[in-house]
């Protein structure tokens, strides 16, 4: 049997108190009494892995579960659909245009339910089975809900999803097709309130957060995001990029990926740590950094094409990742998001949902402000596919023209509608 990290308990990110309770999903009780909402993280003893060569860490399993020895659940009982092992793609054309020759995309749209949420849900549902959960629940407008539904179906557990009436129909279909019971609520706050009652009254197992203000998701599930860092490091022959850009709302991915980098560094597998950058429509983390806040405050929200990350709330875990890495947040606009979505599709053949294209929006913005070194290695996490919300792309797509009867007419239409001069 290979050595593996040992679970100590759940640790508060702020006061560092450690709790042994395995089903503590409402954050740190001590900090909550002080009025500070803080998520917990799984405290791991990495000592059994010290001295290992990095290639010894990855097991014979495939995908995410190759790194079971640094996860808080037993790999031999993994609830898996083949998540992980997603490609790291060098964006040469976009990089050339932006003056960033080492620009990469970690394409998480190639996971089983087409988003990086599968990493969280695989680990969270595995833990749910370990602790004997009977019902799984989540509040989600799409990716997280679809993934939770799929992994619940994998083990035959009922799944109750609280979504919003405004969620795209495609997302609602994805959640229902896996057999989940989906109900639409008028506001995020109302769905969290109902979900919390299911957790506290009936012991439902949550894969997402359910508190107001939010603290983030299930701490065990967040551990799944660490494997993104492990996979990127392996692609770079056990090195780290200079910058990692993550679309962020409650910052589960941002924090989880950052935690992966800190573990790799603690184990001696990488020599340097990357800066983390959060791309966010309303900028609660950006605001907290600008004002020197210890805890993010709620900012003015509104509508955004990037529905999955359109939150006026930031979290302590997200701010922790940015501060610890010397990173930053970037406020982005719908116009910039759609421009980035189009650029990824037209120049690199990658159809990202608006919330995923937000990562490129942040890079384009920073590049235009001369805040990026052209020689730096930059990795953007493309969190999900544009097929989840195809309607969001319509503003930059022309109507499909009818084909003329004659070839000369066809060439004229191609020139007029698509700008293609193909007659020579």
Each predicted region: which residue ranges?
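PLP-dependent amino-acid enzyme catalytic core
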Residues: 1-424
């Amino acid at each position: 049997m290979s050595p593996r990290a040992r679970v100590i308990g759940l640790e508060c990110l702020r006061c560092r108190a450690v709790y042994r309770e395995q089903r503590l999903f409402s954050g740190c009780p001590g900090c909550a009494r002080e009025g500070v909402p803080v998520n917990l993280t799984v405290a791991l003893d990495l000592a059994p892995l010290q001295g290992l060569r990095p290639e010894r860490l990855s097991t014979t399993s495939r995908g995410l579960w190759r790194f079971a020895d640094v996860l808080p659940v037993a790999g031999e009982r993994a609830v898996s659909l083949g998540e992980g092992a997603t490609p790291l793609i060098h964006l040469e054309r976009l990089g050339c245009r932006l003056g960033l020759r080492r620009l990469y995309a970690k394409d998480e749209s190639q996971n089983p339910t087409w988003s990086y949420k599968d990493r969280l849900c695989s680990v969270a549902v595995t833990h749910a089975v370990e602790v004997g959960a009977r019902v799984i629940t989540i509040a989600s407008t799409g990716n997280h809900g679809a993934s939770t539904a799929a992994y619940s179906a994998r083990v035959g557990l009922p799944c109750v999803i609280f979504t919003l009436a405004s969620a795209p129909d495609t997302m609602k279909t994805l959640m229902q097709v896996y057999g989940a019971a989906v109900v639409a609520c008028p506001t995020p706050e109302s769905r969290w309130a109902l979900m919390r009652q299911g957790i506290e009254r009936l012991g439902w197992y949550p894969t997402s957060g359910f508190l107001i203000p939010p603290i983030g998701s299930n701490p065990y599930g967040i551990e799944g995001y660490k494997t993104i860092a492990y996979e990127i490091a392996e692609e770079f022959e056990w090195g780290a990029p200079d910058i990692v850009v993550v679309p962020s709302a409650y910052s589960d991915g941002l924090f989880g990926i950052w935690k992966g980098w800190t573990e790799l560094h603690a184990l001696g597998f990488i020599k340097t740590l990357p800066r983390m950058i959060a791309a966010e429509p309303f900028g609660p983390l950006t605001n907290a950094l600008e004002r020197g806040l210890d805890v993010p405050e709620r900012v003015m929200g509104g509508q955004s094409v990037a529905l999955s990350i359109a939150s006026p709330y930031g979290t302590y875990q997200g701010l922790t990742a940015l501060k610890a890495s010397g990173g930053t947040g970037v406020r982005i606009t719908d116009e910039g998001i759609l421009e980035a979505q189009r650029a990824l599709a037209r120049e690199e053949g990658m159809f990202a949902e608006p919330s995923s294209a937000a990562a490129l929006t942040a890079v384009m913005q920073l590049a235009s402000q001369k805040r990026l070194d052209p020689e730096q290695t930059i990795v953007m996490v493309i969190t999900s596919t544009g097929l989840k919300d195809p309607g969001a792309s319509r503003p930059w797509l022309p109507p499909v023209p009818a084909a003329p009867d004659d070839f000369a007419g066809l060439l004229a239409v191609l020139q007029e509608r698509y700008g293609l001069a193909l007659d020579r």
